[in-house]
Amino acid sequence: LAEYCRKIGAPIVPPVPIEDIIEKHLKLGIEFDDTHRLFGVPRSGLGLDPDILGAMFFDERRIVIDTSLDPEENPAKEGRYRFTLAHEGGGHWRLHSHLFAKDLAKASFLDEAAPPSVVCRSSQAKEPVEWQADFYASCLLMPRKLVMAAWDEMFPDRKPRVIAPAVPVEHPFVELPRIECRIGNFDCSETDDNVLDGVARPLAGQFLVSPIAMRIRLEKLGLLHRTVPHQRIIAGGG
């Protein structure tokens, strides 16, 4: 981001212009295609959602994103599209090009002339290069400084939020109520994720990312908590 800011001579404001960064600054091509057809892998799962979200062709300097994530065709997928783009072009390109650019067969399962160096599948267990690219994408789209500023604007008290504990304890956070509901033996209470997503959603809209991505980022930054950290209980009570 610092490189891009110097290049354009202006500070970054949310949402981070990820397409400009990828295409104009990093000089990478962005293409949409049916990734499952392209790689000969059948779609599966509920609604036949894509398992292959994107692929990085290092030697060709291009990124292929599944057509289902095209924000012009599916505006509701814009957050996921931007994260996939940041994952491929930000994470893999900046972190892993030295691993794959000269060894096209290293991460390929294809026998074609120009296979992708990295194929990202949502169903597979995260390998180190994948969670590294995820974290890079998260920091790129939701920079700590910008997220903290947006949080302070949304919550002038600047305090982190925590899901209200079942047993009251003294702590310095602001508690988030949870809707409790039970029908017979069926517990239909709000999940932790739903409670935290409700806080993350406005910021997700500001940064053009999914509520899930923003919620994870806010948890990593210590602004959202599922339980009161033990040290905070002591600090709050002392």
Feature locations, PLM:
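Active-site hotspot residues in diverse enzymes, especially metal/ion-binding acidic/histidine motifs
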Residues: L1-G238
